[in-house]
Structures are given as C-alpha cells and as structure tokens.
Amino acid sequence: MIQMQTNLDVADNSGARRVQCIKVLGGSHRTIATVGDVIVVSIKEAIPRGRVKKGDVHRAVIVRTAKEIRRADGSAIRFDTNAAVLINKQGEPIGTRIFGPVTRELRGKKFMKIISLAPEVL
C-alpha cells in the first residue's frame, strides 16, 4: 500500500536511489496504490551523472511492496521494502537494468518490458 508521502527505493539504474510518492494516478479520489500501479514521484536522492537529478518529477510503476499481495490461488507475497521503477510518459522504463525480483502482477498491467529486464519474476 503506497500513498502520498511514501518513500520508495528505486529498482533500476536510472540514477535515482530514493523517491517519494506525490500522487497516485488512476482517479480523482484514489489514495492507495499497490504493485503494478503508476504513481508520480519526486526524486529525493540520486547518484552523480545519472539520467535523473534530485528534485525531478517522474512517473514510476510499483514493483515491490512491504504490504502483502493476495493472489487468486489464495497465496500471498510480500517484500522487505517498497520499490519502484521509473518510467516515461509512454510507460517504458528510463533505466536499462532492473535490480531485484518483481511480481507476476506486472504482466497483467502490460509492463512486459520491465518483466523482461528483471532477473527474477515471483
């Protein structure tokens, strides 16, 4: 469960390290986002010479959450941290590599490029 002011780790090599959610996209009164949802983030921490800079505003898709995700078969999956991947307006990742596992729920949300770059899909 990601909401406004939530800090997330960045799971790609775009140059950002930490981001903060400033808006959950998908409706005027939507307050909560989960895996596969698109949010608007502000870059809070970035590395030198990266593609993005501190203070930039970008879109991101959530790939891992600490709150468990319920699946249709009754199982649940959760992670230690909240993580996101920065994307452009067309929904393509800004970075060229993805770090750490991502969930199968991204497949249903049409983020196949992120799934193909990820080292592990759970």
UniProtKB/Swiss-Prot annotation:
Gene3D superfamilies: Ribosomal protein L14. CDD domains: Ribosomal_uL14 (cd00337). Keywords: Ribonucleoprotein, Ribosomal protein, RNA-binding, rRNA-binding. One of its GO terms (cellular component) is cytosolic large ribosomal subunit. Transmembrane segments: none annotated. Part of the 50S ribosomal subunit. Forms a cluster with proteins L3 and L19. In the 70S ribosome, L14 and L19 interact and together make contacts with the 16S rRNA in bridges B5 and B8. PANTHER family: 50S/60S RIBOSOMAL PROTEIN L14/L23, LARGE RIBOSOMAL SUBUNIT PROTEIN UL14M. This is Large ribosomal subunit protein uL14. It comes from Paramagnetospirillum magneticum (strain ATCC 700264 / AMB-1) (Magnetospirillum magneticum). The gene is rplN.
